[in-house]
């Protein structure tokens, strides 16, 4: 039997690889949302925060 792990089991801890990049990613999300006319506010939680 082959000894392997599938992709879902390899990185199941959901740790941020580059925690300092989170602010830049959030800024990018706001910029893209504004280009599409979407207003992001405190009620729009990310999927990471919601689990």
UniProtKB/Swiss-Prot annotation:
Gene Ontology annotations of biological process type: DNA topological change
Xref: Gene3D superfamilies: Small, acid-soluble spore protein, alpha/beta type-like
SS bond list: none
Superkingdom as given in the UniProt entry: Bacteria
UniProt keyword annotations, A-Z: DNA-binding
Transmembrane segments: none
One protein family per Pfam: SASP
GO molecular function, one term: double-stranded DNA binding
Coiled-coil stretches: none
PANTHER family documented for this protein: SMALL, ACID-SOLUBLE SPORE PROTEIN A
Family in the record: Belongs to the alpha/beta-type SASP family.
Protein name per UniProt: Protein SspM
